[in-house]
């Protein structure tokens, strides 16, 4: 079976706040955007049942299209915002702060305070040459490339296929327009 609403409740609540909708199905969840502008949010990552840190990268891509300023505090892992450099090269307006913008309890003792990314939107994304750095950051680059105007070249996509089963087939089923080198 697929994911359940209960397992993803925090993510689903944020998804709705941004402007998305979803239906719980027997074998998973169907997501869609009902139209209208995306809304900015302020979130902090956390361990389950909080907002999962693995979801912050694709959320940040979506927030580049939200109207206003969003803030994402990363409180679980260090150095999770490196992927934003490529998004800025594609036209995003993301500023990463090495110490948080608010007083949040540390999750891991003796580590620096959490990082925060401030995303100001909406900003049109344009095509660029992007190299996949890691699994989740790279998948976010791929999402941004698909959302961008113009052509992007994404290299090192083998990393993504190791972490997401049949992702190329799934992208095609969603109507993504891309070519693989021969």
Model-predicted regions and their roles:
Residues 1-182:
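Short, structured segments at the rim of ligand-binding sites
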């Amino acid at each position: 079976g697929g994911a359940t609403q209960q397992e993803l409740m925090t993510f689903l609540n944020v998804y709705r706040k941004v402007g998305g909708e979803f239906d719980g199905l027997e074998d998973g969840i169907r997501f869609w955007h009902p139209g209208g502008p995306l809304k900015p949010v302020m979130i902090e990552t956390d361990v389950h049942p909080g907002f999962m840190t693995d979801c912050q990268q694709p959320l940040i891509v979506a927030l580049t299209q939200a109207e206003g300023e969003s803030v994402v505090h990363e409180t679980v892992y260090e150095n999770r915002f490196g992927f934003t450099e490529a998004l800025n090269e594609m036209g995003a307006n993301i500023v990463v702060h090495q110490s948080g913008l608010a007083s949040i309890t540390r999750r891991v003792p003796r580590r620096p305070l959490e990082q925060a990314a401030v995303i100001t939107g909406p900003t049109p994304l344009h095509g660029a040459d992007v190299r996949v750095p890691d699994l989740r950051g790279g998948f976010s680059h791929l999402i941004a490339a698909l959302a961008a105007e113009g052509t992007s070249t994404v290299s090192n996509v083998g990393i993504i296929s190791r972490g997401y089963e049949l992702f190329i087939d799934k992208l095609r089923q969603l109507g993504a327009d891309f070519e693989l080198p021969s």
